Amino acid sequence: CETKAFDLEQSRQILTKAGSLGFPLKIHADEFDNLGGAALAAELGAASADHLVKTSDADIQALAKSNTVAVALPCTPFGLAEKDYTPAKKIIEADALFALATDCNPGTSWNESMQFVIALACRYMKLTPAQAIAASTINSAHAIRRSDSIGSIEVGKQADMLILTVSDYRQVGYRYGTNLVKQVIKRGRVYSVDVGYYQTA
């Protein structure tokens, strides 16, 4: 829902039709202009509204009253050399659910690293490392409606974890430009980043 893309009414038509066909709803909105896409997402019960750089205070309140996750994509304004970023602190202070993602695409955000996303969020959106990590894990799971099975380390959930080469979790927000991952655990299988083998946990 953006100028030069779909206007608010077109976005409503598309999302309403998609919802009637059983699709979960997501929208990219308010990246360059506030057309009301975030409030529309909240109204229609979308899983998430993404970008939200220009989202108004009133629309942030609408998100806070809904189950729609506000997803910031800081690599996009970084990649476009923009000065404005998603008002993450306002969103969190309003008690809206807030997540982070890469928006990986070849046009504006060719970045595959969530570690870099966290670093940008700490610098330009003033998140604490703890807030940025939560936004990248359990809150991101909420944004795809899978928080019941992934996103946190809990009994009964899928065993997806990263083992990092840091002595303090806060270094994830402080260090950037290098891969901090030592091992990946996916569905209980352990993958070594260095040598590429895996074993069943």
Each language-model region and where it sits:
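Metal-coordinating catalytic core of metallo-dependent amide/deamination hydrolases
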Residues: 1-36, 104
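Residues that line or immediately flank small-molecule/substrate-binding pockets and catalytic motifs
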Residues: 3, 53-56, 166, 188
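Intrinsic-disorder/low-complexity, polar/charged segments
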Residues: 4, 113, 168-169
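Active-site-adjacent C-terminal substructures of enzyme catalytic domains
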Residues: 24, 34-149, 176, 190
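Acidic active-site catalytic centers that drive phospho-/nucleotidyl reactions
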Residues: 30, 50-51, 103, 160, ...
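C-terminal cap of metal-dependent C-N hydrolases
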Residues: 136-138, 158-201
